[in-house]
Regions:
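Short, surface-exposed "cap/lid" segments of acyl-processing enzymes
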Residues: 19-64
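Catalytic nucleophile-loop/oxyanion-hole region of alpha/beta-hydrolase
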Residues: 64-76
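Serine-hydrolase catalytic core
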Residues: 159-223
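Short aromatic-enriched loop/helix-cap "lid" or pocket-rim segments at secondary-structure transitions
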Residues: 42, 71, 132-137, 221-225, ...
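Surface-exposed acidic, glycine-flexible loop patches that form ligand/cofactor-binding
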Residues: 20-21, 84-90, 113, 195-203, ...
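C-terminal catalytic-base region of ester-bond hydrolases, centering on the histidine
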Residues: 196-291
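Cleavable N-terminal signal peptides of Sec/SRP-targeted secreted and luminal proteins
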Residues: 5-24
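Serine-dependent carboxylesterase/thioesterase catalytic core
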Residues: 26-28, 32, 57, 73-179, ...
Length: 291
């Protein structure tokens, strides 16, 4: 081989290695929201494959559409069973994108899986601190109720069998919420329970927590719930950093934030059902965290 050909051989060797480099992205798992299913996430899947070629993207087909109103802990167990094999087969870990109600399902999954390997946990407009508002979803399920009266139904044993009621957080009925919430209150460490330390340790295994939301969402109420903020009893929004569960570091949020692991991405002009198909949202808030 002549000296003049050696650079050519080197270049070809590098080019042959490129496909394996390109396909080295971690798998992405998508968890849908209320009244959603995998079909709603085809655009997002395309965004991921265009920017990160070769990425394995799985949208979990479970509790789709009307089945999404099943109790949250029931859904958590089902999604856990579906997600665990994907995590186990991914030596370098996975990324998790969770939309709307799916964000709370993902929180439940990660709190109760001892050795998960989620690297980036991306919450896409999720009611992380709860929901309290007359959105179109609310009126679809509870047409005869107004938000100020829904606690009469949600804070009962029967109401707690419906997903929306599992994270209904009435700021004017704090005692009833803490007493009757079987999902959100224990998950956010707002009530004492035997698993609180264990759940906290599991959740803190993540490397990056990305919170995405915006003021024009129209469904998540208040929209700051997507940033772990929520109303006080005067319906004034109290930001994440001033919430009791943050101050007490009940589930590790304060620690993650102090370590620089929490990223907030606020985008105006995006309606709730458009978050996962808005390319600017993908570019600004999601793409960089999927390596």
């Amino acid at each position: 081989m002549t000296d003049g050909c050696r650079p050519c051989v080197f270049i070809w060797a590098v080019l042959l290695l490129l496909p394996s480099v390109i396909m080295a992205y971690r798998p992405v798992i998508i968890v849908h929201g209320l009244l959603d299913g995998p079909a709603q996430f085809k655009v997002l899947t395309n965004f991921i494959n265009e920017s990160h070629p070769g990425t394995s993207v799985t949208t979990i087909a479970l509790y789709d559409y009307t089945a999404s109103v099943k109790p949250m802990w029931q859904q958590v167990e089902g999604f856990k069973e579906a997600i665990s094999p994907i995590m186990e087969s991914a030596v370098d870990g996975v990324h998790l994108i969770c939309f709307s109600q799916g964000g709370l399902i993902c929180r439940g999954v990660l709190a109760t899986v001892p050795h998960h390997n989620v690297r980036s946990l991306i919450f896409l407009s999720s009611p992380l601190a709860g929901q309290y508002g007359d959105s179109s979803y609310f009126k679809h399920f509870f047409p005869i109720f107004i938000k100020s009266r829904l606690y009469h139904f949600c804070y009962t044993s029967f109401g707690q069998k419906i997903s929306i009621c599992n994270y209904w957080n009435d700021p004017h009925q704090r005692e009833r919420y803490l007493k009757n919430s079987v999902f959100l209150a224990p998950l956010n460490g707002e009530v004492n329970h035997d698993n609180s330390t264990e759940w906290r340790n599991h959740f803190m295994h993540i490397e990056k927590l990305v919170l995405i939301g915006g003021p024009d969402d129209g469904v998540i109420t208040p929209w700051q719930s997507s940033m772990f903020g929520f109303y006080d009893d005067d319906e004034t929004v109290i930001d994440m950093e001033y919430q009791d569960y943050y101050a007490s570091d009940a589930f590790g949020l304060k620690t993650l934030n102090s370590e620089g692991a929490v990223e907030k991405c606020v985008v105006s002009g995006v309606q709730h059902t458009h978050w996962h198909s808005d390319y600017s949202v993908y570019q600004k808030c999601i793409e960089k965290w999927l390596t």
